[in-house]
Structures are given as structure tokens and as C-alpha cells.
Amino acid sequence: MNQPNRGQILQTVFSHFFPVASPDSELVPSSLHEDITPILRVAKDVEDTNPRSLFLQDLDIKSVDDSINILSGHSHALDKANELDPTSSGRDVRQFKNTILQWLEKNNESTLKARQKSSDAHEMQSFYQQYGDEGINDLLNAGAGSSSSQRTKIYQTAVVLYDVLDAVHRKANIKVAAKILESHAEVEAKNKIYVPYNILPLDPDSKNHAMMRDPKIVAVLKAIRYTSDLTWQIGHKINDDEDVLDWLKTMFRFQKDNVSNQREHLILLLANVQMRQTQRQPNLLDDRALDTVMEKLLGNYNKWCNHVGLESSLRFPKDKQQKVVQQRKLLYTGLYLLIWGEAANLRFMPECLCYIYHHMAFELFEMLESKGSKKKYKPKNPTYSGKDEDFLTKVVTPVYKTIAEEAKKSGEGKHSEWRNYDDLNEYFWSKQYLDKLGWPMKANADFFCKTSQQLGLNKSEKKPDLGDGCVGKVNFVEIRTFWHLFRSFDRMWSFYILSLQAMIIIAWNETSESGGAVFHKVLSVFITAAKLNLFQAFLDIALSWKARHSMSTHVRQRYIFKAVAAAVWVLLMPLTYAYSHTSIFIVAILIYLSPNMLPEMLLLIPSIRRTLEKSDFRPVKLIMWWSQPELYIGRGMHESAWSIYKYMMFWIVLLTSKLAFSYYVEQIKPLMGPTKEIMSVPMPGYWLPEFFPHVKNNRGVVITLWSPVILVYFMDTQIWYAIVSTLVGGLYGAFRHIGEIQTLGMLRSRFQSLPGAFNACLIPNENTKEKGIKLAFSRKCHKIPNTNGKEAKQFSQMWNTIINSFREEDLISNRELELLLMSCWAYPDLDFIRWPIFLLASKIPIAVDIAKKRNGKHRELKNILAEDNCMSCAVRECYASIKKLLNTLVTGNSDLMLITTVFTIIDTHIEKDTLLTELNLSVLPDLHGHFVKLTEYVLQNKDKDKIQIVNVLLKILEMVTKDILKEEIKRLHLLLTVKESAMDVPSNLEARRRLTFFSNSLFMEMPGAPKIQNMLSFSALTPYYSEDVLFSTFDLEKENDGVSILFYLQKIFPDEWKNFLERVKCGTEEELDAIDYLKEEIRLWASYRGQTLTKTVRGMMYYQKALELQAFFDLANERELMKGYKSAEASSSGSSLWAECQALADIKFTYVVACQQYSIHKRSGDQRAKDILTLMTTYPSLRVAYIDEVEQTHIYSKGTSENFYYSALVKAAPQTYSTDSSDSGHMLDQVIYQIKLPGPPIIGEGKPENQNNAIIFTRGEALQTIDMNQDYYIEEAFKMRNLLQEFLEKNGGVRYPTILGLREHIFTRSVSCLAWFMSNQEHSFVTIGQRVLANPLKVRFHYGHPDVFDRVFHLTRGGVSKASKVINLSEDIFAGFNSTLREGTVSHHEYIQVGKGRDVGLNQISMFEAKIANGSGEQTLSRDLYRLGHQFDFFRMLSCYFTTVGFYFCSMLTVLTVYVFLYGRLYLVLSGVEKELGNKPMMMEIILASQSFVQIVFLMAMPMIMEIGLERGFYDALFDFVLMQLQLASVFFTFQLGTKFHYYCKTLLHGGAEYRGTGRGFVVFHAKFAENYRFYSRSHFVKATELGILLLVYHIFGPTYIGLFTISIWFMVGTWLFAPFLFNPSGFEWHEIVEDWADWKKWIEYDNGGIGVPPEKSWESWWEKDIEHLQHSGKWGIVVEIFFALRFFIFQYGLVYQLSAFKNKYSSLWVFGASWLLILILLLTVTVLDYARRRLGTEFQLLFRIIKVSLFLAFMAIFITLMTCRLILPQDVFLCMLALIPTGWGLLLIAQSCKPLIQQPGIWSWVMTLAWVYDLVMGSLLFIPIAFMAWFPFISEFQTRMLFNQAFSRGLHISRILSGQRKHRSSKNKD
């Protein structure tokens, strides 16, 4: 066998890495990717053309192999192998080489036989010359006719082919021909020019490209390429197309791809801004556009300079030409973009970028000035300008490494022990720190904490005397404590506490004292206020203690002075209050309030306050110093006076109602009488030991009774907020015309107004649309004058585009499509729009019947037609169509003359109103029938019907047949035949919803639409990790519980499946399965109905389609518009116009998907990467950004390697040389930009880091963030340019909005009742909830997608999210916090909607709620919320609290109220106090009863009812509410209350917050019992068991009555215990129960855990993970955990005195002590048993059994003795169990908290055994009732109806699905 020639590596990749016939170029190891992949791709292109050339290209790849030295002696192969990877040490390299080699050995002979020339060298030369002749030369001859992508592809291919040719010639010692060398030199030069581009092709031959012909882009290009005044570095070769960015790259050493990326970014930014301005000089860059961009881009930098007291580095030459000044502005602007584009993770630190930019801009200024100076000296070079990539390695990398090192500490450390992004950024807010850091950055500065050697900085610098440590937290420390709630919102808590004190004083003294005395006592609230102020000052110092060394001097002084002042007032207030004259105390109060008077007075004049707060003037700062900390952010946030008045009135009404209700009805006044009576009642029958015997007036009882009342007082504001916000939101929505069109009937009634509304809203119009209150009361619409007008044509094309989109999405059938489409052809004699047939349904048959019955009564018929405009239009159109049809069908002059005469007579009678009187229309129904038959025959156009047609024509007028316009005949036929059935068109509920919402939105307030050229440009960004892209055939057919996803979707969407079959022209599923190529269509159909990336991409790419159509409307003339956009798209004559439309759309819109793992998926052959590539091929404008991890081997370091990271952007590569057009699998991507990073970019929260990586590739002035489980619609895309105009309108505010909030539609609501509950809850939040947040409250933030950001504003202020680990878990809302703190404004708009998928299973929903609760817990600790709470005015602060963490805190108080109430009652009944009090506690229960379900009903139901009522009618809202209750919605919401409570408290106490991926799948399948137990054990089951025991004890010893509040607690207990099983599909199926029991037993087995065993497999592993958070909790968290665990000992303390031996006999503490002795003996016994089991259980089983029997007998002997002596009664055994269970659990909690102290093998093993026993018993007790109910089949049927009732109403036959499961299983069992 011949030795394989050198370089043979290509096709072997394929045989091992990918099982196809040719190699996959995408599976090359990352270390070889850059060199090998281009060769493999070219090989694939030429494979079928010349197989030997393919093989020879493989030969060149073989040169990477040295470890298998087949070609020893060939020095070139060895050299190249050593150069790339001589030891094959790279990841997968050896495997790659071996596989290639195997293929080469197999295919060498076959390729030799196919060789056409005498040698490989001649073969390769022949092919190269052929390629040059046929490829390159044809390309050069084509010139402008070829696209830039084609040119790029061909030149890249030619370069690769030459490399192979050169290698083969050198191997054969043959010189390459001179002609080929000359050709190659030219190709090499061209290849450097024609590089892959993103949007703008900037190569010289692209001047005729539609985008490059735009005068604005030409002007910007001309401006940035003006470099004649710039001095280049010595040796630099200047090219004609170089620009100012190239100069900046050369001087500051930026990366090439960064420069290319920001060049396009800058060009598009400037061009888009210039498009909106009035042109002065069309071919020159307008200074106004440049100033606008520069001001917005560098606005934050200028503010920063003013704040830190630095002179701006933006300095411009005086008395210079405009070109020079403009060039300087471009340099400054470009410099910032280049810094930002290469800053990587530093983009989260905007002021750090300001610091870098400040120094680099000053160096730029010095360079430019030195060049223009008259003095002769060498121009100054930048500090970091030595080598390529110096900016990355010397500026970005040191800061990045500091971030990375700090992030490593975040793993298990406390927030206070490491610096997050905000801490590091705030370092740059202080000039003293900037001076310490210096420029160039000092390696030993306290910012870094690293040595200069580690950072690679200048080691020769002298170290300043800064100490060895690094600076810590600067302005804020996140301490994990509940006190953050008081510290952040101290004014609110002070208000509540002082109001409560005042109300109690008034109620207590209402009848006993005079008004003056009561007033004097009420004034004592200021003493309390002083104490609260001191407490707040103490909290500020305590929680900032760890930052005491690093915070600025003025901040320290402020804290100290506030504490001292507060302490002084705490002393002065009581002294002055005790003075006999009240006036002195009032004077003291006025003096006390004076420091805060100025800010509160300025609240009424917000403009002055904003000015003062934003001022950096020292005297002003001194005045504001007391009330406002000197921070860079959080200043000037106040709204306009009108906005302040609105939310002030909102809160005045709310607080007045709340306080009045609390005082008069609920809490204060009604309780005063019972409280006084309790305090006066003696307590002789006290059963328990008294710890405080000298306390008088039963104060302990009063505290016990009042504690839950106080908690309710602090909690019920949330309920009042729900009430008031619902009313305000509903009223506001009604004025905004929400829900005006609710049904198809309403749509039909107002459809004729749609063209006018469309014209007013979506067509650029000089007339200003009505807004505000004028629009709220207006129903007037613009009218379209006639059918031949441009507006009518635009509306019909837009409407038809929407309807066609419905058909493509299979929402409507072909027949519905025909009924919904509008005719695009107009009759000259008709003066109205030809409406869709569904609007005219049954009008013709009715009109015919009316005409027959009204024979002779023409005026009556005319009046009927005048009243029904649709009927009139239908009759007139039908008449015109028949006239046209007959004139077309009939030939012959005499026949035509006869027809003309007949129609002339009819027209004459119509004009004279004598049609019915002069003509007999009684035969009109027969004539109607004949025309129906005629249209049917003509439509079918069959030869056999020609005789029939002739017969019909003879009956109506002797006509002949002729083929005419089919669409017109179709429409006429539908007009004649369609009756009542079309009244329900479309039948699909989703299509109805979308049509009604779109139509309704046209009557809502929105900005006018600008022309496409004048609209703001924008991008959409979707972060994607590893979710489903496109369902595979395997996934669709794989059965889960006997049901496949495809089968499930077919039942969920039966009408859409039927429409799909109709679209692909398959009558049955069998026909569908028989056609292979339709499998891809099935995958798409299913993916469009799931939460997949494919669905999201399709929706977002509707933007492109909408913009192209709108651009066509703007650019087309009358004639082109009448032809329609489709004719322009299809015809060659319209290609130029359509190319211009596409170019405009590309300029205005960019879509980037941030696929973080794309390169990993691609190199591993993951199907998700191929599906993403398919999306890029389907949508050429789609771009994918990803993180590329490239391994590079160090040749001289014995095979060591290093990973480098890149931000990369790819698009679908052009397929120039695809030999088989049907080969859809030959798809490749093409790297556009690849920007090197300083290290792994994911060092914080993954999602925001992923967004940050991709944001540099977005374009435009706005950025829409879209999640990968969202959907979009073509009709909504038409309104995007209106929405973007909101950025240019203040809408009554003082600032332009920086975030535009949009409403969402939850499209997963139909899956199950849980999905319905969740979607209703979510829908009310994203509509009425956010409506109120935005207006009037002005506290809407960013709650995720699909909000639209002011992109330039946010990219200079930290991005669209925050990424610090854990603290920014809810990364979205922090973007809203950040925007508001930096003087941004967030608005909300409901005339546009985006689809959103939500979780559909209980476990999914609970994980989502857990994530949000965790995030809210972290928000509570955050600096953002603290600053908002302090910088907002009082009323806006209240809004901020109750709409963020306040909701979760009030949910926590709701549950705590239950605990406090029950433990209080436990104390009362066990101590005998309740018996002494009689009926007094009844009052407490009555008051608390109103709070039981109010929280759930009002917080969840009220907004839902209001919003559903607005949008669909209040009858439907009431019906839905009742139906939700029948489907146990109260159970669901009560259960979720427990989820919020558990995870919010756990996060605040111990941390442990983490991202919880909920999945995007269809979760309607059964969850195992063990899985539910693991997830809900500690969050619900344990707490429910505790409450159940409390209720049980209370009912045993308490009164016999059962109050409403007690019933509600029992309901909560039952819900928390059994809701997971009640909402679990097939939860009561017996076969599932059996399987669950087996799985539970396997999981709960003791000692089956250990290292590496996942929690899903072992109870031990799960338990260790469950208590893991305690190991990392702080000391205070452990103390609080232990303190709360002590509550379980109350059971033992109370119940031990209820034993028959001690009851009413002994009340000494020795009884309680003796009980502990018994417990310790019992625990010791358990320990002995556990020890014996471990030591003797295996080898000495007999001895172990003897020990167990002995202990058992001893226990029984003692028990029988006690029973015999009557020391223990049977009921005492039960009481002992009730006391022992909580006590043991309390000991277990304490032991778990103290694990580091007691982690001895013996002790910890005992703890584990105790925990295992509790879980075993609790799980078994839970399982018993479930198994019992599974015996009864009707329970399972009821559960199925309850879970899936909503789906039943939409045609979902869940019973068929479940029966399919059972049949499937039974068939398996039989097999």
C-alpha cells in the first residue's frame, strides 16, 4: 500500500467525529480550528468537482501531524507539525489526528485512480488555474453584479487553494509558476480587503450596494476618513480607506476586530441620527448629528468629571476649520466606543470606563496639540502603546483580574467579605482614590490587591505608602440582616410606629381626659421619633462598620454627626416634654424637624430640588449634606409637580383609608375596651410557673393578644394597596381605551373605522394625533376618502400581510384565509373599500330576500341598505363584480351590446329610485342561484362542465365561457354563498385575540409614526444558554408516561394541526409520515408551539418583514404601490426599490442572539448548534454572538496549553459552491468579529454576563431585551416605530424615558389549570400592575423582557442588567434601579404586546417563585434599594417599598401572624389564662378572621378581575373567578404563599440564593412522591405539621368553638401538606402510587449516600445539601436560627404540666427540668442503639438483637409500672408524644445549626439518625392518605377534570391522553 502523502487529514474527521460521508469542518479541536477549518470548508466546496484536489487538500492538513510521522524526512511536514502542536497535547488533537489518518489510509488508492494528471502537483495546479479562470475572473468581470459576500467567499477559497498548491509543489521540489504567483499576490491583497461584514459592506466594490448609496452613510464615511491632519506612527503604511478609528487603533493598540465592529457601530449611529434631521448639506456629516451622539455617549463622562472635580479631557481647538473640529469630535467619540467595545467585564463599571477614557482622551488631546504646536518636539505617545493588544493586556486585564479574584470569594463567602462590581465601580467616585490609582495605573494601588508581577504592570514604579491591603467596601456593605428593611425605609416604619402610638393614645384616653391633655400625650410621639432616629443612626454605623476605613471623610462625618445629634435629641425631648409648658416642647419639635424641612418643602417645588441635588457647587453641597449623602448617583430623581401631585393623592387616599379602618373598625379602638378589662381581671388560676410574678395588669397576656394585631397593622397596607391600585389601574385603563374591542362582534362593528385608525397611527402623517384627556373621550377616526387612495391600498396590504401570517402560523384555514383577506384590486366606479368577506358574510342572501319581500318599495329597501353599510357595500360590490364578469365572459358585439343595455337600464332605475317599482325582482333568488352555479363552474374550470355553463348562461343571458381572473371570481362566489358560518371567522381563539387586540390598539394613544428613514434604529437581544432550539423528531415522538410531545400538541391545538395538514396538502397523518421532507415541517410546527428559540427568532424577525413593508409604503410611488410590495419583491424592475427597502430595514434593525455555549455545542456536534445554524440560514439578518474558548499550545513548554477567550459574532456563510442545491445540510457559519477577552467572561451571574458579551454587537439607539421563551407577532411589529418615538417625548414628565415597558401575553395559559392560574396572575402584573407602577406611582422598574432600553444611555451607565454574583440574582430589576438612580425614567405602554411563556407545572412554578423570592431577599440587602428608599420623597418611597420587597415582607408577616397567634393561644390555653378570661379572646379571633383569606383574595383576585373585566367584560371576569375557585385556585395561591415565605426568610437569614432553571418544556406529567417530598419538605410540610400540632393542642385544651380564623389555618395546613399531590397529574392513579412507593423506599434507605451520590438518589446526600446553607451562614444567622428553634420547647413546657400527675398540683420548674431528664435518657437510648447498630449490626447481629430486646423490655416494664400506679393515664401517652415530637425537632434544628461544633462521628451520626427518623415518619404519614384516596377511581377522574378543565373547554381531550397512557402500559404488561 502506498504511503499516504503529506497533509492527508481531511476526511478522517468525518469518520470519527461525525458519521457522514464527508468531513465536518466544525468539529475541529479549538487549538487547530483557525488553521484547519478553512481547509476543510474549501474541501467540502470542491469535493464533487475534483476528488483528488479534495484529497490533496487533506494532504496539507496532514502537515499538523508529527506524533505519527508517516512522512519522516519531509521537513516541511515536521516543521509545520511542530509549529502547531508537536506533542498532540491539545484537547482532542490526538484523537482528531488518528481519525484523519485512518480515513486517509482507506481512501488514498481511490483518489489516486481518480487523478487526471501525472502528479499531485500538476493535478493541484490544473485545478487552481481552472478555479481562477472560472471563478475569480468571472467575479472580476461581473463587477458590481456580484455581492460582497460572494467576493469574500471566493477570495478566501482561492487563498486556501494556493496554500495547498504551494505545499504540494514544495513536497515535489517544483517551483510554482510565475503567473500563478502573480495571481496569488493579487488574490492575497484582495482577501485582506474583502472580509466578512456584518451590516455595512465597506470594501471598495460595494459602492453600488443599496446601503452604501445612502447619502447619510456616504457623508459619515467621508467624515471619518478625513485623516489628512493626523500624524501616523513611523513605518505605518497608509491606505486610502483608513479612517480615524484606524488611527486610534495604531496609537492606542486596540484590536483589529474591535475597530471594525465599532466602525460600523459609529457609522450607523451617526447616519441614523442624521436621517432624522433636516438636511443642510446632504453629502456632509451634520454637526448637529455628531453633537447629539457625542452628548449622549459622553454625557455620563461629563457628569463624572464634574462630580469628582476633574477638568474634562474633551478639549477642542479654537479658530480651526470645521473639518478639524469635526475630526476631533469623531476622535473623542470613537475613542470611547473603542474603549467600551474592548472593556469586557469592565462594561459593568461605567465610572471605571470614565476614568480610563479620561486619561486616554487627555493623551489624545496632547498628541493632537503637540502635532499642531509651533514648538519642535517629538509628539507624545500614549502610556500604553508599545505592542499590539496593549490596551487589552495593560489596561483591561489588570482590572479584570481584580474583578475575577474578588468574584472567587463570592462562592461561599459573605457579601461583606468581597467586592462586587458596584464596589469596584464606586472606587472611581472619589478623587482621593483616583489620585492613589494614578495613570499609568500603579501596580501596588489599593484597588488591586495584587503584586505588579501578577498584574503585569510597570514594576519599576515606586510604591506609595498605601499599606499592603486593598481597599474594601467604599460606600455600602451588604450585611445579611432583616434590619436592612428598617434602614432602607426608615421613614415609612417611623410613620407607622408613630401613627400607631398616636392612635393608641387617642383611643385609650378618648373618654377619660380633655382634648388638650390628649394632644399633649400625642406629642410624645416625637420622643419616640427621636429614639427611632437614634436607632437609624446606630444601624447606619453598625451596617457600615466594615467600610469605616475606606469610606470618604465626609460620609464618616455625616454618620457620626447624625448619631450625636440623634443622641442629643433623645435626651432633650423627654426633658422638654416633662416641662409644664407645652409651648417649649413645640419649639423643641420645630427645631428638631428643621434640618428635614428644606427637602420636604422643596418637594412642592421639584425643579428647584432637582437643581440643588444635582449641583456640584460646594455651598449647595454643604446645604444638602445633612439630607443627602454625597454620592454620584441618586440625585435629581424627582418628577414633575403634576406627577408628584398624582402619586401623593394616591397615597393620601390609601393611608387615610388604612388608618381610619385600623382605628375605627379593625384594630385599635375596638380592642381598647377588652384590653382594659383584661388588665383589670385577676388571674388566680395560673397553671404554669411564673417567670415574672411581680408584673402587674396581666401585661404578658396583653402582649400575647396584641402581638398578632400589631403584625396585621403593619401588613394590611399591602391589601389596601391592592384595592386602590386596582381601582386606579382600572380607571386609567378605561381612559386609555383598553378593552374597547373585546369580541369579534365588536371588531366587525368598528372594522370600517380601522383604515382611518390605521392611517392615523401607522402611516406617517403631518397631522398630530389627539393625545391625553382629549383622546380619552374621543371616538373620532380619520376617514379614507376613496378606494383608489394610497391610504386604502396601504391598509389592505398591511391587513393581508397579517392574515397571511396567520395562515403561515396555521392559526387559520385556507377558507378562513379567503374570508379574511381584502381585495387589493379596486373598481373605478366604487367609492368604498372592498371589505373582507367575513365582514360581508350573509349580506347578499339577506339582501336578495329583502328585495323579494319589499317588491315595489324602493325607498324602504334603500333605507335598509343605508342603515347597514356592510350590506350596502356587499350589494354594490356584487353588482359591479357581476357586471365585470359578464363583460369578460361574453364575446360578440351584439351580446355585449345587449348586456350593456340591460345594465344601463338597471343603473338608470337605481339613479331614479324606481328599481323596485319598474322591475319585477321576485325572481331574484333564482337569479342568485344561477350566478352561484356559474361561479362554481368557472372556478372549477372543468371541460365536462362547459355544457352546463352554456345552459346557465342561456338562462341569464346567452353567454360563452372564458377563463378570467380567478381571485375576483372567488370573491364573487364567496359574496354570493357565504352565510352565517363566517360570523365566527376566525375560529381559532389565538387569532381572535390577536386581531381584537391589534384593532383595539389602533384606537389607543400612541405617538405618530415617522417615516422609516426618520425612525430610531434599534436592536433586539436574546440571551440563550442551552434550552431547546428546535424539537428533534426523537424528542417529539419519545413517550413520557405513554404520551409524546407531538401527540400532546395535536390534542392541545387540534384546529392548528388540521390547518397544518391542509397547508402541507396532506389529508391524513399517514400521508404526512410517508413524506420525508415534511418531517422538518413537523418539527417546526411543534417548536412554534413550545418555548423554543425557534419560536422567538421567528417572532423577532417579523420586525424585518414589517420594516421592509413600511419602507415600501414610504418609498413607492402611486403606481408601484398599486401593484403591491410582492410584485416589487418578485419583479426585476422592482428589485432596486425592494433592495432599498431591505437596506433601510437592515440599517434600522439588528437582531442578535447571545448563544453563550455555541462554540462548545458546535465542536461537540450538538444538535442545538446545527439548529441555530439553520436559523441563521433561514433568516440571513440574524446574528449569533457567543464566547469562543480557544486552546493554544505553547510549543516550547513541553506541550503546555493555555485557554484564550473571545467575544465572537457569526452569521450564515454564503453558499457559493454548493453542487447540490437540495443539500440543506451544507450550511456553514462565518465569523464576522472575534474580539479577545482578558479571561473567562462568566464570573458573575450567567445571564447578564452573556448579555454583556453580546451587547457590543448590537446597533442602534434602542435595545429590546427578549427572553428565549417569548414570541412576537407581525401586527405588533408594525407599531414598533411608533413605540420608539416615545424616547423623544417627555409625556408630561421632566425627562425623556430611558426604558419603555411593554405588556405581555402569556401564551401557555391553556396547558392546565395551574398554567391558567399562573398566567392570570402574571397577566394582571404585566398589565394593570405595571400600568399603575408607571403612572401615577412613577416606580416602574425593569422586570425582565421585553422592555426597550435607550441603548446609548445604558451602555454608558453599566448596561441593561447587573451581574454581581448572588446579590444581583434578579438581574433585570437592578437595571431599572440603576436607570432610575441615574436620572432615567421608566414608562409603560400597552398598545403593543409580546408573547411570553410561563411555567406550567407546580414544581416549575414553585421553582420560579423560589427564585423570585430569593432575588427579593437579596434586593433587601442591596445598595440600590437603600438609595432609592432614601432619595425618593416619602410617597414615592412608599410606592417603591410596596411594589418591590414590601410584597414579600408582607407575605412573610401574613404567615408570621398565624404563628404568633397560635403560639399566643397555646400559651393562654396551657397556662389557664384563657379560661379565666372567658370570651375576651373571641374579639381577637374576630379581628384576625378578616385577614385570613383577604391577603390571597385581594392581592391575587382583585387585579385579575379588574383586568379581565376591562379586556373581556366583567361577566367573563366574574365567571373566570368562580371557575378558578372551583378549580382550587385558593389552594394554589395559599401554597405559593408558603413558597414565598420560606425562601424569602431563608435568603435573609442564611443566603443560599441561586439561579433555579425551571425548564421550558411541557410539564403535564406525573412527578414522583420522593421528588415532591425533597422539594417541599422543609418549605411546606414541616411548617404545616407544626401548625397542625399547634391547632391540635389548642383544640384539646381550648374552647369548643371553632372560629373562622382557625378554620382558615386548618385550610392552610391542608393546603401546604397536600397541594403538591393534588396538582400532580395522575397523582391518584393506583399504578403511579405503587411506583412512587417503591421509589420512595429506595430513596429513603439509610446509609445509601456519600460523596458523589446525587440528592435524587440518596436521602443522606439530600439532607446534607439541604442544611448546607447553615455552614455558610453568618453568626447572627445561626443565633437567629437557634432562637427560633427554641419555640418548639414551648410544647414541652406547657404540656408537661397538663399530665395527670402534675395538673393542678405542681407548678414548679423542677417538673420541667425532670421532663428534660427523661428526654435526655431517651436520646441516650437512641444513641446507644445507633452506636450498637454501627459497631455490632454487621458482625455481631445476635448481640445487637439482645441489646434491642433488653431496652424494649426495660421500657415496657417502666411503662406498665407507671400505668399500674396511676402515675400515667392513656391520654398522657398522647400528650407526651405531642410534646416529644416538637422538642426533638427543635433539638435537631439546633444541632444542625451547630454542626461545626458537634461534628464528631458519634454525635453527628445521632443527629443524622434523628433527622432520618423524622423524614421517614413524616413522609410515610403523608403517603397514607394519598394511597387511600387512590383506591377510589372517581377521585382520579375529579383531579383530571380539575387540572385540565380549561384545556377541555378548548377541545383538549385529556381523558384520551390519560387513557392512552393506561392502554400503553397495559399493552406493555401483556407483552
UniProtKB/Swiss-Prot annotation:
Its main location: membrane. Keywords: Cell membrane, Cell shape, Cell wall biogenesis/degradation, Glycosyltransferase, Membrane, Transferase, Transmembrane, Transmembrane helix. PANTHER family: CALLOSE SYNTHASE 2-RELATED, LYST-INTERACTING PROTEIN LIP5 DOPAMINE RESPONSIVE PROTEIN DRG-1. This is Callose synthase 4. The keyword Ribosomal protein does not apply. One of its GO terms (cellular component) is plasma membrane. The keyword Transmembrane applies. Residues 1-491, 543-558, 605-640, 725-1441, 1507-1516, 1697-1708, 1763-1772, 1837-1871 are cytoplasmic. Its EC number is 2.4.1.34. Involved in callose synthesis at the forming cell plate during cytokinesis. During plant growth and development, callose is found as a transitory component of the cell plate in dividing cells, is a major component of pollen mother cell walls and pollen tubes, and is found as a structural component of plasmodesmatal canals. Residues 513-521, 580-583, 662-701, 1463-1485, 1538-1580, 1623-1675, 1730-1741, 1794-1815 are extracellular. The lineage of its organism: Eukaryota, Viridiplantae, Streptophyta, Embryophyta, Tracheophyta. GO terms for molecular function: 1,3-beta-D-glucan synthase activity. It catalyses: [(1->3)-beta-D-glucosyl](n) + UDP-alpha-D-glucose = [(1->3)-beta-D-glucosyl](n+1) + UDP + H(+). The chain crosses the membrane at residues 492-512, 522-542, 559-579, 584-604, 641-661, 702-724, 1442-1462, 1486-1506, 1517-1537, 1581-1601, 1602-1622, 1676-1696, 1709-1729, 1742-1762, 1773-1793, 1816-1836. It is found in: Cell membrane. One of its GO terms (biological process) is cell wall organization. InterPro entries: FKS1-like_dom1, Glyco_trans_48_dom, Vta1/CALS_N_sf. It is a multi-pass membrane protein. Belongs to the glycosyltransferase 48 family. Pfam families: FKS1_dom1 (PF14288), Glucan_synthase (PF02364).
